Structures are given as C-alpha cells and as structure tokens.
Amino acid sequence: MAEKKKVKEGKGRKGKGKKDRKGKKAEGSDQGAAASPKLKEIKTQSVQEGKKLVLKCQAVSEQPSLKFRWFKGEKEIGAKNKPDSKPEHIKIRGKKKSSELQISKASSADNGEYKCMVSNQLGNDTVTVNVTIVPKPTYNHLLLMKIYLKVTSVEKSVEPSTLNLLESQKEVIFATTKRGDTTAGPGHLIKCSDKEKTYCVNGGECYVLNGITSSNQFMCKCKPGFTGARCTETDPLRVVRSEKHLGIEFMEAEELYQKRVLTITGICIDLLVVGDMCVVDAYCKTKKQRKKLNDRLRQSLRERNKNITNKDNRPHNPKNPPPRKNVQLVNQYVSKNVISSEHVIERETETSFSTSHYTSTTHHSTTVTQTPSHSWSNGLSESMISEKSYSVIVTSSVENSRHTSPTGPRGRLNGIGGPRDCSYLRHARDTPDSYRDSPHSERYVSAMTTPARMSPVEFKTPISPKSPCLETSPPESSLAVSVPSVAVSPFIEEERPLLLVSPPRLREKRYDRKTPQKTPHKQHNSYHHNPGHDSSSLPPNPLRIVEDEEYETTQEYEPSLEPAKKLVNSRRQKRTKPNGHISNRLELDSDSSSESSTSESETEDERIGEETPFLSIQNPLAASLESASLYRHADSRTNPTSRFSTQEELQARLSSIANQALCDQKKRKMTCKTLFI
C-alpha cells in the first residue's frame, strides 16, 4: 500500500511539473510579446564583380508575425505595387526569424548601402550594411602570357616572381618578390602576422603592403605548381632560366614565324627558278627547231635552183635518147616534131645566109605572112612572156603559079636588106620541080637536094601598124617584089646570120613610137632600137594561121652587090581563133614596088597544108602565131660576099637541128613549127 502511494505522488508531481512549465512559457511569451523585435548586425560585404552575394537579416528573439523588408538607399526592393523595383538577378527568401537577399551576379550597379527592416504589432527594427563590388582585374598580354617582371635589386641574381592580384580600391597592383627586401607598387611588402599567415594555403607566404590598413588586402607568394590569390589553384611546373628568359616569349613566336616565312619564301624562289629554267629550255628548243627548218628550206631552195640551172644548161632531156648524128634528111620522112616554147626562149638559134644577086623578079622570095585576129594581147610584156612557140616554117615551091588569098590583103617582110631601108618580098611559085612529083609527097623536102637551090624561109610574125617595113595593100590585090635567094652555110662563124631567134628577154626592148613611113630610105633596122615597136603602143594583132606556101628556086644565085641586112625573128605567140578560117592578110611592098597578083584558090592551100604536116599547123582552131620583126644595120654581121657550102656540110648542119627538134617532141607534146635550115 505504501508503494502505490509513492507512485501516485510521483504522478501527481509530474502533473504539477507540466503545469508549472506551461505557466513559465506563458509568462515568457507574455514578456516577448510585450517587447519590440530586434535584428542582428550584418557585416560589410565585398564581392568581386560577377560573383554571388548573399545578405542575411536575422531577428534576435522569436516573435510571431514578423515582417521583413529590404531597401537600397531609400528605395524598397521587391515592392508589391512596383514590379519593376525588383531586378531579375535579385531574390528575397524569408523565414520566421530571418530574411536573405541573394544577388546571383554582382555588378557595379549593385554597389551601395542596403537596409533590412523587421516589424510586427509591437514595433520594428532596422539594420544597414555596405556592399562593395570589386571589378574584375584587367589582365594585359603580359599577364596572360605569364611574363615575369624583373625587379631592380642590390643582388645580381633575382628569382622569378609570380604575379598576384592585389585588390586595393579597384586597382590591380603587381607585386614581385626577391631574396631580401622587396619593393613593389605603392610601398614595401611586409610579411603578415602569425594570425594572418593562415590566409595563404599550400605553403604560400603571406605579405601585406605598407600603407594599406585594410586587413583584407593580402598577397600570397605561392610555391611552384600553385597559383591563385590564396594559392588554391594548381599550375603545371615550368622551368625558366632567368639568364636567358627576359620576359620576351614573343621572340620565340617571332622566330618561329620568321622560320615559316623563310621556308615559304624559299619554296616560292625555287618554283620561280624552275619555271625560268623551263622557259629557257623551251626557247632554246624552239630556236633550234626554227634554225633546222630554215636550213632545210634554204637547202631545198638551193637544190631546186641547182636543178633548174642544170636543166637549163643541158641541151637534151635525159629521159630522151641523145640525138643521132649524120642523119641524112634527103629522101627521108620528117616526123611531126614539137619544139617547146621554153627551149625556144632559152636557146638562141642563128642561121647564116649569104647574099646573092637579083636574078629574076619572079623568083627567090622570102615571104612573111600575117594573120590578123579579133583579140588583142593585153600588153607587150604579156605577149613576150607567153608560152607560145616561135617557129620558122620552111616551105618548098612546087607550083609556078602565083597565089594570093581572096579573103584579104597579105603582108610581106623582106629577108635581106638592100641599099634602101626596107626591101619588099614577093610571092613566087615558079619552079620546074613539082612538089607532087617527089617520091614522098607528104614529107619530102626537095629544097635540101642542092645547096644552090634552096627554099625560101617563111615566117609567121605579128605586124604592127608602126612597123617600118610593112605596108598594107587594098583587098583583092597584093604587091610583091622578088628578092634574091640566099645560100645556107652550116657554119655560123663563116656566115653572119640574117635570121635570129632570140630569147624573150632580149625582145623586151622598148622601141620608139615614130612611124617609118615618113623616112623610108633611112636605116631603122637596129636590134636594140626599132621605131616600129614601142612598149607603150598596143601589142600586135594576133596572126592568122598561115597557109602552105610553096617556093622554089630555079636559077643559080649570084653574089649581091648590096650589103645584106639582118633579119631578127622575134618570138611567135600562139593565138586561138574561134572560127578557124583564114581572114585578111597583109602584104609587104618593096622599094622596087612591082605588083603581082595570084589566082590560086584557098582550098588548094589547105590541101597542101594537110598533106605537109611539118609545114602546116596541125590544129588551126587552137593556135595562131605572132611575132615582131626586128632589123639590124647592114654592116653589123652580114658578109657582103656570097659563099657556097658543100652538100655534106649542109646536110650535117640540118641533121643536128632536126634531131634536136625530134628530142623535144616527147617532152613538150606540141606541134613542130620550126625547122632551121
């Protein structure tokens, strides 16, 4: 029973104790509620720009219904009615007994004085705090490149110092250290007190600058491998030689840059040199090739000129067989030969004649026939350079009748000169020998049997209106004067030629325009000066195709008492007639002016031309002949005395000339129109 009473007493005590506590609490609460709220002091804050800043306002006693407000200056932060009063980077967090003002990124605008106010029904309390925003240090290129500063000191050897930031009134102070006393910035460095040595960690040494009273301005000298304001950051170890490293690491970069520049420059120079070498090589090769081509061209031109010269100098074509000698032309057939115009131009052939007396007025005449054409040559030089053949047609008289073309007048040209300027020719066919009586009527040359009886030479020559030895007779009539025939000598040296076939360059001489009709007795027969022809005058009319004229001598020749003149046979040019008929002809009148007319028909001349191929033109529709008559002085190369040669010498001379004509037949493929006797 006694234990139960104790328990009850204990219980009773517990109850009483609780009541006592509650009473005490009520008393305390009554006392707190009766007093106004109070706030704790806030320390001054200094924050680097860009970092987070937290300001905490806390009440001393816990009282119900406490209300906190923040002010910057006189302006409330985060007012309800003013939404713009609270910046985005500022936040306010409230609790029962405290309130926090959080600035996420401090800036220079956040620098200033802040005020915290707490209030309730009993009263209010206010606390102020100063906030300092330190700007970020401005690092120059020396700091970024870790370039060390050299400190002037008494000692020679100076240790490399580490750059540290010293915050002092928004200024960055660069400090250096050395063995012994150090000097930097506004004053000397002083080691921190024992209490402040813990500011630097990782074995760093703490220093304070003289003249700065703030306890927060410290500088740490970090050991190798650490960096930062308090040596909290690690830095890779770098070994730097103080003798050579003078804080100019840019020199290394500059040296590297120079090396690169030199390398690139060298490569460019090498490329330029190689390009120049290639250009020079190509130029040399091109020059050599051009020189070779020029040499080949000169050699080819030289060989061609040499071949042309050799070809001109050779008397015969090597493709053709050499001419046969001692060929007798008597009683032989003469083939149709073709003499090239080029050989006639290149070679000058002379035939010597001897003068003889006049024996008859009806025999021994040399006839030159002209054939006028409808077309005129473009110039004297054109007619001279044309590739027409120049030929002398030798005919033998077989009939005694005189022949005159009924279609028009006929021109005559004297073969030898008398005492006057121009002696006129005459057409005679009187001979006892008949052409048809020969054993070979088509190709037989009866004029070659005896030296005393020779056939006259018939020329096809152009006759200019200004010719000194030509006169025009009216149609249906002809004037002829007999001239003595001449004997032919095979030796050019003995007899001076009256007939000369000269190259075309000798015929390109200019002549005077004066007409010789006014002075017929003067000698105008010089080779280099012929007044009958002039370079500026019109070229001669093209000639008609000559018909076959037959002449023969029947009497012996007598020496002539008059000096003979040279007759130069100029070149003859082929002309083509569209109709092929024989038109007007001109006859030459001699000084003795004896007229004669013939009545032989034109058909008989054509028949004789067809039967005698080497005395006529094979194609009368394709060619006509043209030539110019030139004369020389009587005393130039004519022998006044007549000479007679033997039959053997005459035949040898004629055979050589005929063989040359035979050799040129295959090469030129033209009709033979000349046979030199």
UniProtKB/Swiss-Prot annotation:
Proteolytic cleavage close to the plasma membrane on the external face leads to the release of the soluble growth factor form. Isoform alpha1 is expressed in brain and muscle. Isoform CRD is expressed in brain and spinal cord, but at very low level in muscle. Residues 37-132 form the Ig-like C2-type domain. Keywords: Cell membrane, Disulfide bond, EGF-like domain, Glycoprotein, Growth factor, Immunoglobulin domain, Membrane, Secreted, Transmembrane, Transmembrane helix. Residues 1-260 are extracellular. InterPro entries: EGF-like_dom, Ig-like_dom, Ig-like_dom_sf, Ig-like_fold, Ig_I-set, Ig_sub, Ig_sub2, Neuregulin. Residues 281-677 are cytoplasmic. Residues 13-24, 568-578 have a biased composition (Basic residues). Residues 397-407 have a biased composition (Polar residues). Residues 1-43, 78-106, 294-326, 350-375, 397-418, 457-479, 503-617 are annotated as: Disordered. Residues 188-232 form the EGF-like domain. It comes from the Eukaryota. Belongs to the neuregulin family. This is Pro-neuregulin-1, membrane-bound isoform. The lineage of its organism: Eukaryota, Metazoa, Chordata, Craniata, Vertebrata. The gene is nrg1.
